[in-house]
Regions:
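N-terminal phosphate/diphosphate-binding loop that engages ATP/GTP or pyrophosphate donors
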Residues: 2-75
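Glycine-rich, phosphate-binding/catalytic loops in enzymes
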Residues: 6-7, 124-127, 163-166
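Short aromatic-enriched loop/helix-cap "lid" or pocket-rim segments at secondary-structure transitions
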Residues: 27-33, 119-121, 158-162
Length: 238
């Protein structure tokens, strides 16, 4: 869906652009095409911008690392280090986008601060601590609009079993069931946040894109995002 949306609106004003494309344009690395090198560069750029702006995000970073330190031994050190890297990278990428974004661009970010919530709290072997989820949500910046792609739990389970998931080591039906249940529990917590609800766009299919709240409390950006999503879907089918 992201590619369809970007392709449909890349020549518009404001331009719709994927976050990684935006980052590489700002850093003058658009010439870099190799997927692995782009992933490495994204991690390094995110780390640098996180370090340069860490004073702005001390509460978030302190919370994240303290929570990772308290995790039970069932969560391996390797997994914790990976999550810590993602926290640093996503924080840095957010700061870069915030610094260079303008009214001429709409940056679509598929791994931002809200994705940090998923990485920190969703595990196969333990249920999420909802109180801690709420605490982190009170500290992180919320984007102008949040897109929620929904699918029945059965479909999510089938897709995960078919594709595999690097955070579900066992790969069994029971392990996948537990991981998805914990993920859905965290997403319900996100949807319950007043700040997120008014910026949330629910996508069940290309023909079912609508604001999560319909009582007039939604963000002014939501209707514009809905138009972009629907036109991107139609363009992709044409």
């Amino acid at each position: 869906m992201l590619r369809k949306i970007v392709d449909r609106h890349q020549d518009d004003c404001p331009e719709v652009i994927a976050a990684q494309t935006f980052v590489f344009r700002v850093i003058h690395l658009s010439w870099l095409k190799n997927a692995m090198l782009r992933r490495i560069a994204t991690n390094l750029i995110g780390l640098v911008y996180c370090l340069l702006n860490c004073h702005k995000n001390i509460p978030i970073l302190n919370f994240s690392f303290a929570y990772l330190k308290r995790l039970p031994s069932t969560i391996s050190l390797r997994e914790r280090i990976k999550i810590a890297r993602i926290v640093l990278r996503n924080t840095g990428i957010y700061e870069l986008i915030r610094r260079y974004d303008s009214k001429e661009t709409i940056v679509v970010l598929d791994e931002g601060f809200l994705q940090i919530v998923h990485y920190l709290f969703v595990y196969e072997s333990m249920a999420p601590d909802i109180k801690q989820v709420d605490k982190l949500l009170s500290q992180i910046p919320i984007p102008d609009a949040v897109i929620l792609l929904s699918a029945p739990k059965r479909v999510l389970k089938e897709r995960t079993l078919a594709r595999g998931h690097d955070r579900i080591k066992a790969g069994s039906s029971e392990a996948v069931e537990a991981f998805i249940s914990h993920a859905l529990e965290v997403f319900e917590c996100l949807k319950a946040s007043p700040e997120i609800r008014q910026r949330l766009v629910a996508v069940n299919s290309c023909s079912n894109v609508q604001p999560f709240v319909t009582n007039g409390d939604q963000s002014s950006d939501v209707n514009r995002i809905i138009e972009i999503l629907i036109s991107g879907c139609i363009y992709g089918r044409a």
